[in-house]
Amino acid sequence: MRDTSKVVIMALLMASMSLTGCLSDTEIVEEIVIEIEPELGAYSIVAPIDTGINVYHDRFRLNETYPDWLLEGLGVTMTCNLTQNGTWQERYDADKESCWDVITSSDIVYCPGTRIIGTTPDDATDIPILDDPSDGHGTAVTGSVLDANPDAVIFFVEGFSDAAVLAAANQPLVDIITTSFGPIGSVPVPGIEDATRVAVVDYNKIHTGASDNTPSPAVQDSTAGPPWSIGISGYAEEDDDQKETMSGSYPDIAADWTQLLP
């Protein structure tokens, strides 16, 4: 789906041809077209699993399209060419019939001109893949991923279930799965730990899980606590030097608590 550049080689072949009663030089011009697919460069594929993502946000724009081999490797089944002008509602309405109304739970959707490839394995959603503008959690999480890794390819999964985690785990090209949800207060109840264990142990993914937005111990959190997951908490900024965590306690890694996110 990438527009491949064409290198045109002009070969001039001069041949003397003997014609009846005279000699003439005939110039033969042969055009040879060689297609060269530009390299993607160094990258990693990160799979945020969250509420949805605002694919219309300027933060996710990309002035190129991904190469066919990458899209085929991720199992893309559908392309949505997004409307680029107007409010979120105006653009959604313009693309509704051709895109959002026809996406199914088995589709993997690529939006050319963005960094986003997305899927919604759960059917219980009003608009597949898209984030509710009044929510924005998945959009913000993905923005933080790109702040840390500007060259990341985003394989976004909408949902909070084992099926959502496994949709990312089953992708051979996905490197990292990141989740930022769970029970309030890190109540030690079953969550997605079975699916993240499969993702890490069986499929060799890296899983990072956010701690709860309280000082509750991260080790008991179903997302951040398992030994195969990397638990992330937030710390107070400025001169705190990570001494005061604001989101979970006893994490594996403390990250900055406040960022300017989309």
Stretches with model-predicted labels:
Residues 22-45, 51-59, 189, 198, ...:
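Protease zymogen maturation seam
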Residues 36-144, 152, 172, 230, ...:
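Active-site core segment of subtilase-fold serine proteases
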Residues 50, 221-262:
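Extracellular S/T/G-rich loop segment that most often corresponds to the catalytic His/Ser-adjacent loop
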Residues 52, 64, 182-184, 213, ...:
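Short glycine-rich anion-binding loops that position phosphate/pyrophosphate groups of nucleotides
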Residues 133-140, 153-231, 239-241:
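Substrate-binding/access-modulating region of protease and related hydrolase catalytic domains
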